[in-house]
Regions:
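Hydrophobic hinge/microswitch elements
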Residues: 35-48, 53-54, 104-163
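Central regulatory/effector-binding core of bacterial HTH transcription factors
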Residues: 1-60, 128
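Short secondary-structure boundary segments
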Residues: 55-56, 78, 149-151, 176, ...
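Short, well-ordered beta-strand segments
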Residues: 1-3, 51, 75, 99, ...
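A late-sequence structural motif
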Residues: 12, 162-200
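Flexible hinge/capping segments at coil-to-helix
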Residues: 59-98
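Short beta-strand->loop
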Residues: 63-73, 149, 158-172
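Secondary-structure junction motif
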Residues: 82-83, 88, 97-118, 186-195, ...
Length: 200
């Protein structure tokens, strides 16, 4: 039983699951998609055995296996008058136009931390329940947003007039990790699963 957060599930699982079924037909994986907050709570209460999420995030006492690093990109309308450079500095982000996922999603916190501008927390609009929704809002010129590189690589911008550029910040990355309860007797299974996830 594994929880996966929504800013990872649609971009990593389609590549990973077919290969896992082929190579490990004996492994029965029951998946559920939850926000980071709910997924960690499910792990703590024994509703799931492991969680695929993005760090940093408060997880309590857990063991973890590193999967990958994932950069953050700034997404904006193609005809944005500011014509953002190849690497977008946080100072160029208009916090009044910044659209983020609502509370409970760790990507919101990662985006705010990467910008290192405390005033953004009050000004940014926490509205989206999915990255696809945020992209559609940007495509309709309602603001700009932050996207993980894995979403951009998976084609989330296809069919839109939205472009994405890397955020120029030392904190503009998140760690994709598999976590499980400390002292779990299934540690070897989780490490094997992490190895399969790293192979992507």
């Amino acid at each position: 039983r594994m929880s996966v957060i929504p800013t990872i599930a649609p971009f990593l699982l389609p590549r990973f699951l077919p290969r896992l079924r082929r190579e490990r037909p004996d492994l029965e994986l029951l998946l559920r998609e939850e926000t980071s907050h709910d997924a960690v709570e499910s792990l703590q209460h024994g509703r799931v055995d492991c969680v695929l999420l993005a760090l940093p995030f408060t997880t309590g006492e857990v063991e973890k296996a590193h999967i990958a690093h994932d950069e953050l990109y700034v997404a904006f309308p193609k005809d944005d008058p500011r014509d953002p450079p190849e690497f977008v500095p946080p100072s160029m982000i208009d916090e009044g136009r910044l659209l983020l996922l609502e509370d409970g999603h760790c990507l919101k916190d990662h985006a705010l931390a990467a910008c290192n501008r405390p005033e953004m927390r009050a000004s940014a609009t926490m509205i989206g329940t999915s990255l696809h929704t945020l992209v559609q809002m940007v495509d309709n010129d309602l603001g700009l947003t932050m996207l993980p590189k894995m979403a951009v690589d998976a084609g989330i911008l296809n069919g839109t007039d939205v472009v994405a550029r890397p955020l120029k910040s030392k904190n503009a990355t998140r760690e994709i990790a598999l976590i499980w309860r400390k002292n779990s007797p299934r540690r070897a299974d989780f490490e094997l699963l992490a190895e399969e996830l790293r192979a992507g």
